[in-house]
Amino acid sequence: MIKEYKTITLQEIDSIAILKLNRPEKLNAFNMQMLEDIMDAFDEVDRNDNLKAIILSGAGRAFCAGADLSAGDKTFDKNFDTRGEFEEDFRRDAGGILVLRIYNSLKPVIAACNGDAVGVGATMQLPADIRIAKKSARYGFVFARRGIVPDGCASWFLPKLVGISKSLELCYSGDLISAEEGSKIGLINYLIDDEENIIDVAIELAKKMTENSSQVSVAMTRHMLWSYSSEIDPEEAHIMESKLIDSRGVSDDAKEGVMSFLEKRKPKFSNKVSEDLPNFFPWRKSKFKDN
């Protein structure tokens, strides 16, 4: 184990971090302790230069059944969402706090959906770079059925993946959809047979994406594509790409990347995410006082 937590596990396999929601007796229902644990785990992975990517999955037969409803009709009042109190003039939703932390990860994120993902269990997967799922898994954006609205910045992420009309259909109805349907509409990137070990599949995918690439370049690429794919025109993307190419072009990693190609060998990159990010990153300041 990389570190011990109350509601999750965090371990390393082949330089890949495996984060599992670990309340299987509650179908990994989400609570404030889980929020704190996941946030800390992502901080831990970002700090550790030996870890190249993070996989998010669940223990047991479910990925996450959504918010822990054990408080009954008090579940969604302000006493439940204590993490959201902070210093804003409004109470931030816990799912959004979680999703924004995943979104800001410096390492690639793969969601490996081992079973049903409902409510925040579905929305926390949206900021993952890749989403894979077992064929038996189901997804449900059930918020309207609980008398609330989608959380976790879903109104920003979900339409980017499946389009506005399909997003509205999923959120209006709250219907559970199969992973196969999720794959057809763009929610899921890869379907995995139930007999396969989804963690093994996710690890191989993570290694494929990272083992021959500069970690700093991967971190910057992740933030570039997530940040600038939503710009009104491409000029802002061009400005940032130009700055980053200038910055990375004189780095030791750039020299190694060129020479390893010319010498027909695997690269040995030395730059570290913890030390070698450009001095103008992050290029966008958070709107929230607690960040």
Residue ranges and their predicted role:
Residues F30, D89, A112-C113:
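Structural motif
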Residues P24, I132-A137, I188-I239, V250-K255, ...:
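C-terminal long alpha-helix characteristic of the crotonase
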Residues M1-A59, T75, N279-N291:
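Conserved CoA-thioester-binding segment of acyl-CoA-metabolizing enzymes
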Residues L170-C171, T221-L225, I245, F261:
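Short alpha-helical scaffolding segments that buttress acidic/His motifs in well-ordered protein cores
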Residues G58-R101, A117, G147, I232:
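Glycine- (often His-adjacent) and acidic-residue-rich active-site loop
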Residues L19, R23, D37-I38, L56, ...:
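Terminal peptide-recognition signature
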Residues L100-V216, S251:
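Crotonase-fold acyl-CoA enzyme core
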